[in-house]
């Protein structure tokens, strides 16, 4: 169902921008910007969180094939810890828009804030359920980040990262307390900081 999407917004060079990964305790925040081609409609677009993994994967390939322009960008863990998650997200969104090979007339940003851009921009609350280009951006960002988390599952076993994607689930928090943070954990986030300090304190006690 696409009842909330306004396909009139596909008629102009409108870029949709969205992010995935503000809430997790580990990994980058990933963003995407997409300019859809009104001559090549993509059926089934919706907020990525409302789609099955198989549907997201299929749309991921179709969006990349049919969009006039798209860019997937990111802010790394180091940037999140240095800037804070909000500013890092704004930076990643800025990178996504600047990475488009076509300059949009307007950038519509999912949420209630806009990054600093060289083009006109407007926030759209729940835009991934209303604006097709934002829905497309949400799919590109989520599939990209989810695949990265599945790879990290192999590099850092024991945390369940491939399942919870870095979000603070009971399984993740228990593993964090038991195993300590990995290099991909965000030490500016309270649960990670607490786990790090607990292990540091334990090490000092042993010394």
From Swiss-Prot:
According to the UniProt entry, the coiled-coil residues are none
Iron-sulfur found in the keyword field: no
Which example biological process does GO assign this protein?
A: DNA replication, removal of RNA primer
Cellular component (GO) terms are: cytoplasm; ribonuclease H2 complex
- Which EC numbers does the record give? 3.1.26.4
Gene name, please?
A: rnhB
Of which family is this protein a member?
Answer: Belongs to the RNase HII family.
**Matches recorded under NCBIfam families:** PRK00015.1-3, PRK00015.1-4
This molecule's function is given as: Endonuclease that specifically degrades the RNA of RNA-DNA hybrids.
Compartments reported by the entry: Cytoplasm
Q: What is the lineage of its organism?
A: Bacteria, Pseudomonadati, Pseudomonadota, Gammaproteobacteria, Pseudomonadales
Indicate what this protein is called per its UniProt record.
Answer: Ribonuclease HII
The note on the cofactor says: Manganese or magnesium. Binds 1 divalent metal ion per monomer in the absence of substrate. May bind a second metal ion after substrate binding.
| Major subcellular site | cytoplasm
**InterPro entries, alphabetically?**
RNase_HII, RNase_HII/HIII, RNase_HII/HIII_dom, RNaseH-like_sf, RNaseH_sf
Q: Sorted alphabetically, which keywords does the UniProt record give?
A: Cytoplasm, Endonuclease, Hydrolase, Manganese, Metal-binding, Nuclease
The enzyme's main class, written as a single word, is: hydrolase
- Please indicate if the UniProt record lists Manganese as a keyword: yes
The record ties this protein, via Pfam families, to:
RNase_HII
Write down the PROSITE patterns for this protein, in alphabetical order.
RNASE_H_2 (PS51975)
Query: Which segments constitute the RNase H type-2 domain?
Result: 12-201
Q: Which cofactors does the annotated protein need, by name?
A: Mn(2+); Mg(2+)
Q: Which Gene3D superfamilies match?
A: Ribonuclease H-like superfamily/Ribonuclease H
Q: Which SUPFAM superfamilies match?
A: Ribonuclease H-like (SSF53098)
One GO MF annotation is: manganese ion binding
């Amino acid at each position: 169902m696409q009842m909330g999407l306004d396909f009139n917004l596909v008629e102009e060079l409108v870029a949709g921008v969205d992010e995935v990964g503000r809430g997790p305790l580990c990994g980058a925040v990933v963003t995407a910007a997409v300019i859809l081609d009104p001559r090549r409609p993509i059926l089934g677009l919706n907020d990525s969180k409302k789609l099955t993994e198989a549907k997201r994967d299929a749309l991921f390939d179709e969006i990349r094939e049919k969009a006039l322009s798209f860019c997937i960008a990111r802010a790394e863990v180091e940037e999140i810890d240095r800037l804070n998650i909000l500013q890092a997200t704004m930076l990643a969104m800025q990178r996504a828009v600047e990475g488009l090979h076509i300059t949009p007339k307007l950038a519509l940003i999912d949420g209630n804030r806009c990054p600093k851009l060289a083009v006109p921009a407007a926030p759209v609350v729940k835009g991934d359920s209303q604006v097709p280009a934002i829905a497309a951006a949400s799919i590109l960002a989520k599939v990209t980040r989810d695949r990265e988390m599945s790879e990290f599952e192999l590099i850092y076993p024991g945390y369940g990262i491939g399942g919870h994607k870095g979000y603070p689930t009971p399984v993740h928090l228990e593993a964090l307390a038991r195993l300590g943070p990995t290099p991909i954990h965000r030490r500016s986030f309270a649960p990670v900081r607490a786990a790090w300090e607990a292990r540091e304190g334990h090490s000092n006690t042993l010394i």
